[in-house]
């Protein structure tokens, strides 16, 4: 008996890694459905190989004529609203949310309320509306297993430890492409440089986030909500080798770390198989091959966005939502060559300063905070407030 999987974001890096895992275990999992944003050629390739029941093309600007309404036995859906339809399909048992950005919020909620097992790779969902998501997970008794490598590592460690013994959780970070660049040279970083990452092959938005360690800031906020750990018990260390993915410090002074080859197939396979063990070796990486492992504190002058994430998380309410939306809007401006790399955290800071923090109860209130934050970034750009600083 195979388990039916719905994969949201099949054409991205996490989506491609998920497909690798499905290929490795055809007797265990079946791709029931998947989504792409606008990569129709990729959609056709995946459909030909996996023959799913449904495909969702979420972009409102997709050329419907390329795929039509049916491809072989596969039904084609269009638009962001169809993402929710996809995850609610009765046959779907596991939903992997690999969509980048706050667009993943509503389909994630749909999966939770429909009682699906959730492999969550869309960190923005918990960042933007953590308290709401927490309450829905508890209400619907939803099983959630994180897919991000760091959170999955911590999940596995914490599951095996007595919670009363835990002192602190540590997220590791490569430090990005500019970890050794003199700080004064960050002002001249180009888009081409910022789109390169030393460890992971990711999409443009996540690569930009990672090179400024804003991605790690988002992960700090996500870890707070996933594991119910206060911010003063969450740490970040630079680990250039990207072999240790998570560390748990114990009250007695000992530490446990989770190590593997830096490949997303490990956390994805764990998420799909949980609570059962993954039955075969995915990629052996014995300790004798690790070489030297380095760990160091992050420099918040080099990575101001990381510090802003901790601040926003501690404030709570809509502050993390504003942080995320302002970052998405600023990264979009950077990718259009309208602002500099080092100005991204400045736009986030200014946006947080300009918007009143609320403590909402509904999804619509969080979405309104998201909208206002994006609009504020555009207004700041038009007024040249940040550039003038």
Swiss-Prot record:
InterPro entries xref list: DXP_reductoisomerase, DXP_reductoisomerase_C, DXP_reductoisomerase_N, DXPR_C, DXPR_C_sf, NAD(P)-bd_dom_sf
Family: Belongs to the DXR family.
Keywords: Isoprene biosynthesis, Manganese, Metal-binding, NADP, Oxidoreductase
Cofactor(s) the protein needs: Mg(2+); Mn(2+)
Task of the protein: Catalyzes the NADPH-dependent rearrangement and reduction of 1-deoxy-D-xylulose-5-phosphate (DXP) to 2-C-methyl-D-erythritol 4-phosphate (MEP).
Gene Ontology molecular function, alphabetical: 1-deoxy-D-xylulose-5-phosphate reductoisomerase activity; manganese ion binding; NADPH binding
Listed GO biological process terms: isopentenyl diphosphate biosynthetic process, methylerythritol 4-phosphate pathway involved in terpenoid biosynthetic process
Binding annotation for Mn(2+): 148, 150, 219
Lineage: Bacteria, Pseudomonadati, Spirochaetota, Spirochaetia, Leptospirales
Record flagged with keyword NADP: yes
Catalytic activity of the protein: 2-C-methyl-D-erythritol 4-phosphate + NADP(+) = 1-deoxy-D-xylulose 5-phosphate + NADPH + H(+)
Pathway per the UniProt entry: Isoprenoid biosynthesis; isopentenyl diphosphate biosynthesis via DXP pathway; isopentenyl diphosphate from 1-deoxy-D-xylulose 5-phosphate: step 1/6
Binding site for 1-deoxy-D-xylulose 5-phosphate: 123, 149-150, 174, 197, 210, 215-216, 219
Enzyme Commission number: 1.1.1.267
This protein's name: 1-deoxy-D-xylulose 5-phosphate reductoisomerase
PANTHER family: 1-DEOXY-D-XYLULOSE 5-PHOSPHATE REDUCTOISOMERASE, 1-DEOXY-D-XYLULOSE 5-PHOSPHATE REDUCTOISOMERASE, CHLOROPLASTIC
UniProt-annotated binding residues for NADPH: 11-14, 39, 122, 124, 203
Root EC class: oxidoreductase
